[in-house]
């Protein structure tokens, strides 16, 4: 990865009940020299995620919410604390994140070839139908700052919102070969996994309505 001027990259890891994998993800990120800082945001986890993160307290920036505020709020909090020129988002449920994956994700934007990069898991020749909802992303921090309030309120619809914000800009999709993240069924009980899938689907639909049909969203959304 070559850049004409020295730049810094902050990596933000939103964490919600990822005790099985978060230690490995953080350890790998700390071992990769291109990151200026690792920011972990515990989003009100009810498992042992916070305990795992506290093991790295001297080496990471740790933000912890007492209640689950949603992925959008977690990312917004990380962006506010970030010192880097660029911010990378990495999910906490990855099992085999490597420096090769990180280099593939960062290269297009550090080379000046993109305004944003989305890295999607690719296995064999099978298409990834959810590629545009990937959590592995890189942006110029300054381009996100005007949208912090929207990001904070988007919950699990944050990827949909970011896609809309960067519509019409140069967004590069890069395959992250054989990258694996645990499914909810692998992390939760079957009942809880189904519940979380439904909640996340609702949040995505809610975000789409908010962006594309605000009048309808105002009618359907519960009042405060």
Where are the language model's segments positioned?
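Conserved donor nucleotide-binding strand/loop of the catalytic core
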Residues: 36, 50-81
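Short beta-strand-to-loop element that shapes/binds the nucleotide-sugar donor at the catalytic cleft/hinge
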Residues: 117-129
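Short aromatic/hydrophobic "clamp" motif used to bind/position activated sugar donors
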Residues: 87
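Cell-envelope/extracellular polymer assembly enzymes that use nucleotide-activated donors
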Residues: 8-10, 37, 161
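Conserved donor-nucleotide/metal-binding helix-loop-beta segment in metal-dependent transferases, i.e.
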Residues: 99-120
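Short, well-formed alpha-helical segments that are part of the catalytic scaffolds
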Residues: 17-31
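A conserved acidic beta->alpha catalytic loop
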Residues: 42-50
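Hydrophobic helical membrane-anchoring modules
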Residues: 1-2, 164-224
């Amino acid at each position: 990865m070559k850049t004409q001027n020295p730049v810094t990259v902050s990596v933000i890891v939103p964490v919600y009940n990822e005790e099985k994998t978060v230690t490995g993800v953080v350890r790998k990120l700390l071992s990769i020299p291109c990151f200026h800082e690792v920011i972990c945001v515990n989003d009100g986890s009810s498992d042992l995620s916070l305990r795992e993160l506290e093991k790295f307290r001297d080496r990471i920036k740790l933000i912890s919410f007492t209640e689950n505020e949603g992925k959008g709020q977690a990312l917004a909090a990380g962006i506010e604390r970030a010192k880097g020129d660029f911010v990378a988002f990495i999910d906490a449920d990855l099992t085999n994140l490597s420096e090769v994956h990180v280099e593939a994700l960062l290269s297009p934007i550090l080379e000046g070839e993109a305004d944003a990069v989305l890295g999607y898991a690719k296995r064999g020749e099978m298409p990834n139908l959810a590629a545009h909802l990937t959590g592995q992303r890189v942006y110029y921090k300054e381009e996100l700052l005007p949208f912090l309030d929207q990001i904070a309120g988007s919950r699990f619809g944050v990827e949909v919102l970011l896609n809309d914000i960067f519509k019409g800009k140069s967004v590069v999709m890069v395959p992250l070969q054989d990258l694996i993240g645990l499914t909810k069924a692998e992390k939760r009980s079957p009942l809880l996994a189904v519940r979380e899938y439904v909640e996340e689907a609702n949040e995505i639909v809610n975000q789409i309505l908010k962006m594309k049909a605000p009048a309808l969203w105002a009618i359907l959304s519960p009042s405060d």
